[in-house]
A protein has these predicted regions:
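Solvent-exposed loop/turn and edge beta-strand elements of beta-rich ligand-binding domains
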Residues: 1-230
């Protein structure tokens, strides 16, 4: 006797079912031995599940230009960056990259949404890499966890069926569209960062300058008030 391994690869299309609705894939192998008159048949099936995220980008003062906002998505489970292609306003994952420079840059659409489909049940980090001028960049990456649990068996082949759940930064998220999409919102606030590129001395000099300006303003106001009283 001998063992033969047959491998094949399949690609999920944009029409793939998402969430708890699986994509069944059945394989039937038929072969005949040279010393027999009958055929042997082997059947196997698998159920593929796929998920997505819907990021809503907002500015706290309803200002800001969404086109200046950029995100990067990292698969923490496999330690790779997500590569995706955009079609009709939706990003579809098509592969992974080991280097950060090769990762896809995700930009919100006109309504502020970034929809990414074709993700596995893994742990992801969503990092904001750029935002509009005069707004504070998101400090920490958003941690997204998509996990599955057994929910039964396929009556036809006995394969385990799955149901999904998700958390965002450790808090339970209510998935939409039959546990297909993880919704989350990222908000930027107006603000500025003091320059620190010159080192500790330069930063302290900047802070000191601001303090001196405040003192000068106080002195001017106090002086004017004193003169008006005279």
């Amino acid at each position: 006797d001998c063992t033969m391994r047959i491998s094949y690869a399949a690609t999920l299309t944009a029409d793939a079912k998402m969430g708890d609705t699986d994509n069944p894939n059945e394989v039937v192998l038929t072969w005949k031995r040279t010393n027999t008159t009958y055929f042997d048949t082997l059947k196997d099936c698998c159920h593929v599940y796929t998920y997505g995220i819907d990021v809503l980008k907002q500015f706290s003062d309803s200002g800001g230009n969404l086109r200046n906002v950029k995100f990067r998505l990292h698969n923490d489970t496999d330690d790779v960056f997500v590569i995706a292609e955009q079609k009709d306003g939706v990003y579809y994952a098509k592969g992974f990259a080991a280097k950060k420079s090769d990762a896809t840059t995700f930009v919100p659409n006109s309504s502020g949404h970034i929809v990414v489909k074709g993700l596995e049940d893994d742990t992801y980090s969503l990092t904001e890499t750029a935002t509009d001028k005069s707004y504070v960049l998101l400090k920490d990456a958003v941690k997204i966890v998509i996990k599955t649990a057994e929910s039964g068996q396929c009556e036809k082949c006995g394969t385990k069926l799955l149901t999904a759940s998700a958390t965002v930064n450790g808090k339970d998220a209510t998935m939409t569209d039959g546990n297909a999409i993880v919704p989350l919102t990222v908000v930027n606030n107006p603000g500025f960062d003091l320059p620190k590129t010159g080192g500790y001395g330069t930063w302290m000099f900047t802070v000191g300058g601001v303090a001196l300006l405040g003192a000068a303003a106080f002195i001017v106001v106090k002086s004017r008030k004193h003169k008006s009283e005279q």
